[in-house]
Every structure is written in C-alpha cells, then in structure tokens.
Amino acid sequence: MTVAITDVVLRDAHQSLFATRLRLDDMLPVAAQLDDVGYRSLECWGGATFDACIRFLGEDPWVRLRELKKAMPKTPLQMLLRGQNLLGYRHYADDVVERFVERAVKNGMDVFRVFDAMNDPRNMQAALQAVRRHGAHAQGTLSYTTSPAHTLQTWLDLTEQLLETGVDSVAIKDMSGILTPHAAFELVSEIKKRYDVTLHLHCHATTGMAEMALLKAIEAGVDGVDTAISSMSATYGHPATEALVATLAGTPYDTGLDIHKLESIAAYFREVRKKYHAFEGQLKGTDSRILVAQVPGGMLTNLEGQLKQQSAAHRLDEVLAEIPRVREDLGFIPLVTPTSQIVGTQAVLNVLTGERYKTIAKETAGILKGEYGRTPAPVNAALQARVLDGADPVTCRPADLLKPELAQLEADVRRQAQEKGITLAENAIDDVLTVALFPQPGLKFLENRHNPAAFEPVPQAEAAQPVAKAEKPAASGVYTVEVEGKAFVVKVSDGGDVSQLTAAAPAPAPAPAPASAPAAAAPAGAGTPVTAPLAGTIWKVLASEGQTVAAGEVLLILEAMKMETEIRAAQAGTVRGIAVKAGDAVAVGDTLMTLA
C-alpha cells in the first residue's frame, strides 16, 4: 500500500517555526518544483496564515490562494479550517460559513481539513457539508489529546459521528506531539478495523516521537501522513519529508516520491529560512515539558514570548504548572487554536494576578457558558455558576443561536469602505469576509492594501548575519524591543555585540502611537489606580470620566495575546483620570484610570 504524503511547508511548517511569516514572494519561485513532486496535497492556506497576511505582511490572503493555484495546478491545495470559527476566534452564522467555503473553493482550494477545538462534531457539521456541496474534499478531524476523559472509545465515537455527517476522509491531528507510537498503532488499527475510511495522520515533532508515531501508524494501515521538507522540519514543526520517503523506499509502503527532487526544494528553503531568523523560537532539539504539561509546541513558543512581553519570563514554569489545572477546570478541552490561546492566557492571568480567576478572560467565560460547544468533561461548577450569574448554559449547537449575519456584515463593510475611501476588490465579498473574520486588522489592511509601510518590513537575507560590532561599547543585558507591533528579545554583551536575537510571540498590531506621552505617564488623579494586568492594546473604554461604578463592573477591555480581557473595578468608586483610549498600547502595570 503506497503511503500518500501531504507537505505542510507552505502553511503549518512556517507557522510552527517562525510565526507564520513566510511571504508569497518566497513561495512562488519554488512552486513549480513543489507541483512536480507528486504529493497527495500541499497545505498552503488557513490556520494562522490568513491572520498573519493581513496583520503583519500586508498581503491579501485571497490573492495568495489564487496565485498559488495558478503556480501549482497539478497538486491539490489544502487548508486548515476551524469549523464554525472558520479562521477567526468566534462562531459565525451558517450563512457566513457557507459563503466562506464557496469563495475558498472558487479561489482555488481543493481539500478542507475541518476541525473543532472542542472536538464537538456539531461545530464541524456546517463547514463539512458546505465543502461537499461545493465539490471539494471534506476531511473531518480528530484533535488528539489525552486526559481522564479521553479513551479509545472517544475517538471511535467521534470518527463515527464524522462519517454520519459526511466526510471524504478523516485526519488524526496530533498538534502537541503527544501521540505515542503504540497509541498511534492502536488508534489507527481500531479505526481501520471498524470503518471504511481514508485515514490521515498529522504529528508535530516537538517531543521527539513523531517519526516513530508515523511509522507505527503506517504499519497499522494509515493511508496518508503530513511531513515538511527537511529544511523546514523538526523542533516545533513536523517530521522531515525526505527521511520518511527514504525510510519507506523499497517497502510495500513506498511513497514513490523522488528524493532528488525533494533535496532541490530543501536547498531552496534552506536559504530562504535565513531571512526569517528573527522570528524563530529558541527550541533546538526536543522538549519533554510538553509531555508533562501537554502544551503544543507553538503554544510553548507563544507563552515564552508573551511572558517576556509581560516582563515575567522567569515565571514560565509556574504558568506551565497552571495550564493543566485550567484545562481541567474547562472540561479537559484539547489545546488547539483557539482553546490553546484561551487556556494559556487564563493561566498567565492566574499567575500574574496572584489569584486564580481574579480576572476571567471573555473567552474563558465563553467556554464555561457553553458558547464554544460541548466540552469533553464537565467544567468547574463553581466557575460556571460565577460566569453564568443565574443564566442557563448553552447546550445546543452554539451556531443555532446565531441569526444569519452575512447581509449585515456586507452592508457594514461597504459603508465603512465608502466612509474611508477604500476601493474594494473586484469580488468585494472576499474583502467582506476578511473584515468579518478580523474586524480591526481586516479594516486596517483594506485601508493600507497598497501601503507596505503600514506593515512589517520585508525581511532581508542579511538579517540572519552577525550584527557588526558597535563603535561605542554598550551595557550588557537582555532587552525587549518592539518594532511594528512585534516584540524582539535582544541580548547585548559587553562591547555591544548582539549575540542573540529571537522573536517573541506575535502581538496584535497596535494603532499608530499618538504623539503624546504613553499611558503610564498620563496623569491618573487621586484615588486607587486601575492598572493593566497584561501588556496589550486597549480594545474599548467602557467607563467615562466621573461615572460612578460598582465593584466588579467592567471598566475597559484589553486585547492581549489575541484575546479580550475585561478589566473590572476592584471596588466601588468614581472614575477619574482616564489615561487611555481605544487603540493605545499599554505595558504591564500602566495606570489606565483611577477610582476615587
């Protein structure tokens, strides 16, 4: 049985290795070679690529898809879709899901790997059915995790539910690299024994088990696996394509791929990758912490960067210890986008505020309320009661509570475009969907579509070279520097040599800084200061000057780590000295306002 290979070099590889920064201009020169390999498919879209395109790169993701399809007409293109969340961080009404899938197919997408962070099949149903209606390949997904609530029967039941919904294949998505070789063999064997289904396996290499898991799954009968070209593999990423091709050559599982063609592609990316050095994580080998904390590799990179931005890098071990506790409180949910961000951010809040759940992120409350779907196990009853505040939890498919919203979204985007003098794309619906998924970054992108200066500068090859010694000696130390909304951790040695340069986790791009002093320097007035628990961007200021507020009332909403955190009044009082406005970037401890 020939094993099919999906290469993830154009999507998950660079998402895992250097924060989704690979640009279209670095993809197109090698596209013809990739198209000539004979892959089952090439993953090139979805996941975080859509967000990164409009937030950091100034690229239109729809144009990227069309250009890749034009450059690789022979190989099916594949994307990762978050079910009812599409590519955003909330549930969308069914009419938005339908239209997004339709436009993705029209622009060139062939294979949709559809997953749900809760493993709730109801949240995958609309997307999977839309994919099949529009003639593309619908792949349902098991987001693999382990917990007291997850057994072999859990995965067999979910497979059956996906087959009942209607899928063309099923993928096992091991986003944390915690699938052991023997568990892989058992899981694949039992699924293939019971169901007539094409089965695919996706593993991350972070713990060092992925290659063994793939091989045991192949022996058990898996039909296809994900790999990444060698120069874009390993650490936070995936097993190397060439290694698996060589391993299976001459066996009944021979992939039929030409390793010489693969080496040529690897050589290309070996050089291209140097340009993105500043965005790479610090992992050089494997990371056993993930086996204990069950944290996906990409999430670990983000946590390291986020804590540096919060001036709390030394508290990583405390956060790693807190993550399993938060996950249990939230019903042992899998740690995959967006739940990995939700659990990680809540763990950071619990540690940095010094009190568990002193601040509950909006998204954490959403899981407790049932707004994200059914959790694998019951959530913490006391926490749920606290956020429900007497209301009933959501028990139906969450999207059933959403009215059709596409018409209103389209009207809103067209109105904003007219007000701001924005020329929409020829197929305006694509721009509408971009803003629907990412309201603030999407609108900023449309305003600056032809203004590269509004986004991150294009990385240059020389950025990976050693920095020349400064003429004037500089003090040694480790500094965090922010450039275009991106935090970099720079280690300067005696004499001014930059001996280490790493990128912290992506932060939401803040609005252009005002000419006035930063928030921390603004007059706060007399009274008890309300301070920022995290570094981030002010999303909304809800309180007004002179307003009387009760203890627990929401004063502001802070966007940090791609999540909204409500800042509440610790006591009753009168709002004085509001020091921030929407769009302001704030640091940990900045005074936002005072309560007199």
From Swiss-Prot:
Annotated spans, Disordered: 503-526
InterPro entries attached to this UniProt entry: Aldolase_TIM, Biotin_BS, Biotin_lipoyl, Carboxylase_cons_dom, OadA, PCB-like, PYR_CT, Single_hybrid_motif
Pfam family, one: PYC_OADA
Biased composition (Low complexity): 516-526
Complex and partners: Composed of three chains (alpha, beta, and gamma).
Catalytic class of the enzyme: translocase
Residues annotated as domain Pyruvate carboxyltransferase: 3-263
Domain Biotinyl-binding: start-end pairs: 523-596
Catalytic reaction list: oxaloacetate + 2 Na(+)(in) + H(+) = pyruvate + 2 Na(+)(out) + CO2
Keywords: Biotin, Ion transport, Sodium, Sodium transport, Translocase, Transport
N6-biotinyllysine, modified sites: 562
Function statement: Catalyzes the decarboxylation of oxaloacetate coupled to Na(+) translocation.
Top-level division of the source organism's lineage: Bacteria
Gene Ontology CC terms: cytoplasm
EC number: 7.2.4.2
Record keyword Hydrolase present: no
Name of the protein in question: Oxaloacetate decarboxylase alpha chain
GO molecular function, one term: pyruvate carboxylase activity
GO BP, sorted A to Z: gluconeogenesis; sodium ion transport
Species assigned in the record: Klebsiella pneumoniae
Disulfide bond annotation, renumbered to this chain: none
Gene designation: oadA
